[in-house]
Regions:
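Conserved NTP/Mg2+-binding pocket subregion across the NTase superfamily
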Residues: 34, 97-208, 215, 290
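Helical scaffold of the NTase/Pol beta-like nucleotidyltransferase catalytic core
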Residues: 29-60, 90-96, 100, 295
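Structured mid-to-C-terminal alpha-helical surface segments
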Residues: 229-295
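Extended, basic/helix-rich recognition subdomains
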Residues: 195-254
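Catalytic metal-binding acidic patch
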Residues: 60-101, 113-121
Length: 295
């Protein structure tokens, strides 16, 4: 599941965030490669959103692997949904419950896992950190949702990363382009969000069952702090493999290959190597953050 929510910046001096519009030809090729099943799944999700949200629905954007790099075997379909006003408890519960039948993990021939992030437009414009997230649906919540437990709206640092991704590479399925709908995320807030994401992983209980995603998320955070680029997981892994000490490379190589569907995920069976890589990556990320703060 996609848990690092993905700033094109120039460094080291005069750093700024640059928004880019997606390359239409590349986007269309990615969508064609992703297939008709994905398009049908997205269409069904849009129908469901219209049904539950009605006139409150302001915009829907497709972003992530589906429009940038292509979906991999375990990739989510990422949807960013924007509404005008907060949801009632009844609509929140009904929408989350109905999304369960439009999503699957593991992926099937007809359904991929959905990740739906819903926000109230006024909660993120004008921009402030940490922004409020109105709702989030993902397969990691399936057991909780089926048990009748629904998350309320909450502050979420991850929205800084997510909105930066969407402003750069997203397809508007409804409403204006993301670069018009949302303000740029200041560099300081982006760096803060990346650091806060890495700081979540302190011990084995924090990455249990999600080892591959955590390793690749750290590679992406490291790349972004070093170069200002937002890259796909496999691209970030390739970049970092050229810079890692030899003892940490096998673990990252495996995580990349698992993501690409080319290897079996055995990272949980390598606890010492896993903890060593995560500790090393977090120290380097903290160093890069300190260097940014001192410039």
């Amino acid at each position: 599941m996609e848990r690092y929510r993905r700033i094109d910046q120039t460094r080291p001096s005069g750093t700024r965030i640059c928004e880019t519009r997606p390359n239409g030809g590349k986007v269309q090729r990615n969508l064609k490669r992703n297939g008709e099943n994905m398009n049908l799944q997205i269409s069904n999700a849009l129908t469901l959103l219209h049904h539950h949200l009605g006139d409150n629905l302001l915009a829907v954007h497709l972003f992530g692997s589906a429009v940038s790099g292509g979906l991999k075997p375990a990739s989510d379909i990422d949807l960013l949904v924007t509404v005008r006003t907060p949801l009632s408890d009844s609509i929140r519960k009904a929408l989350m419950t109905d999304l369960l039948r439009l999503s699957a993990w593991p992926a099937t021939a007809h359904l991929r896992p959905l990740e739906v992030t819903l926000l109230v437009h006024d909660a993120v414009r004008p921009w402030r950190y940490r922004p409020m997230r109105e709702l989030q649906f993902g397969e990691w919540l399936r057991d909780e949702l089926q048990a009748g437990r629904f998350e309320p709206a909450m502050a979420d640092h991850d929205l800084a990363i997510l909105l930066s991704k969407a402003r750069q590479h997203a397809i508007s399925l409804l409403g204006p382009p993301a670069a018009e709908l949302f303000e740029p995320v200041p560099e300081a807030d982006m760096i803060h969000a990346l650091h806060d994401t890495a700081a979540q992983w302190n011990g084995p209980d924090d990455w249990l069952g999600d080892e591959c995603n955590v390793v690749l998320a750290l590679a992406r955070i490291w790349l972004t702090l070093s170069s200002g680029e937002i890259a796909a997981k496999d691209v970030a892994a390739d970049w970092l493999l050229e810079r890692l000490p030899p003892e940490h490379r096998p673990l990252l190589e495996t995580a990349r290959d698992v993501y690409l569907g080319q290897a079996r995920d055995d990272l949980a069976q390598r606890p010492q190597a896993l903890a060593a890589f995560i500790g090393y990556a977090r120290r380097q990320i903290e160093r890069l953050r300190s260097e940014s703060a001192n410039r």
